[in-house]
From Swiss-Prot:
The EC number(s) this enzyme carries: 4.2.99.18
Gene that specifies this protein: nth
Superkingdom to which the source organism belongs: Bacteria
Name listed for the protein in its UniProt record: Endonuclease III
Organism: Buchnera aphidicola subsp. Baizongia pistaciae (strain Bp)
Binding of [4Fe-4S] cluster, residues: 192, 199, 202, 208
Amino acid sequence: MEIKKLNHKNRYKILKMFSNIYINFKTGLVFTSNFELLISVMLSAQTTDRMVNKTTQRLFGIANTPSGFISIGLHAIRENIRKLGLYNKKSSNILRTCEILLKRYGGKVPNNREDLESLPGVGRKTANVILNVIFKKKTIAVDTHVFRLCNRIGFAKGTTVLTVEKKLLNIVPEKFKLNFHAWFIMHGRYICTSRVPKCSKCIISSLCEFKDKNI
């Protein structure tokens, strides 16, 4: 049986429900400055927020500014993030990003997409998170959880993250855009999980169009 896409009314209901249960959630990453969030998001590729937070608790105790990272150098950065995936590439990108932040932006995190995406290791998703969380821009970052959830429940289907992002920007009401990413992260991480979604505990199961619900 063909599964039809959600209509506007049911999408709105889902967002309204999420706004009530995930009201206080912003991001799972722990940070105390714009720079710390930038580094944390750069580290989060192919790893969990829990592992990133465990790593940055130690790392930020050693250095938590661009100049601080340059002072400790590449080897120290690499050794402190060794337990994370892609640590060699990430450590190199972090050091180069710190150099650029000091040279071009006075050590501050830029507040626009073009400048953010010019930083080594900062792609569209990372830029969207920074613009959304720090600068309160109504961007929608589409990561693994958001991509899976949008396709599974029929909220916004697409074969690429960019396709899904563009659809979301068109269909999500303005008042929900600022928090959309955080809500879908929570639901995808703890309820609509990758292998065995917890459909019996899901508040949107009656609206979801996933055909293999395990209720």
